[in-house]
């Protein structure tokens, strides 16, 4: 009796891996053994950078808040300290958005927090 192979599942598995490598350059996009390594590495980078993105955006928000705070005669650290003492709970993302989109409102926040 001939050996039955599971060609449908094998083809589906290969297609799934090749689909993830769509747009990869050269043999990294069409030779299965190379594609497997390339896709594995791409997924490692994606995992790492999803976490790094959070740090990057937080530092961007802090830079924006600091720049806007300095225009209002204070610094980021003094502003955040004063906000915590007055128990004003606006997170950095929203505060940076206010600083960029509505500088007048940001100035009001700074004046209300810093006496």
UniProtKB/Swiss-Prot annotation:
Entry GO CC? ribonucleoprotein complex; ribosome
Keyword Cytoplasm assigned to the entry: answer is: no
GO biological process, alphabetically ordered:
ribosomal large subunit assembly; translation
Q: Which UniProt keywords apply?
A: Ribonucleoprotein, Ribosomal protein, RNA-binding, rRNA-binding
Example GO molecular function: structural constituent of ribosome
Q: One Pfam family this chain carries?
A: Ribosomal_L20
- Presence of keyword Zinc: no
PROSITE patterns in the cross-refs: RIBOSOMAL_L20 (PS00937)
Assigned protein family: Belongs to the bacterial ribosomal protein bL20 family.
What this protein is reported to do is described as: Binds directly to 23S ribosomal RNA and is necessary for the in vitro assembly process of the 50S ribosomal subunit. It is not involved in the protein synthesizing functions of that subunit.
Protein name, per record = Large ribosomal subunit protein bL20
């Amino acid at each position: 009796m001939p050996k039955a192979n599971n060609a449908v599942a094998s083809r589906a598995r290969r297609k799934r891996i090749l689909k993830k490598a769509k747009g990869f350059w050269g043999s990294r996009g069409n030779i299965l053994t190379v594609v497997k390594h390339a896709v594995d590495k791409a997924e490692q980078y994606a995992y790492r950078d999803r976490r790094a993105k959070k740090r990057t955006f937080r530092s961007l928000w802090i830079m924006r808040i600091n720049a806007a705070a300095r225009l209002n005669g204070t610094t980021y650290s003094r502003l955040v300290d004063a906000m915590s003492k007055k128990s004003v709970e606006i997170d950095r993302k929203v505060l940076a958005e206010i600083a960029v989109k509505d500088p007048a409102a940001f100035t009001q926040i700074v004046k209300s927090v810093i006496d």
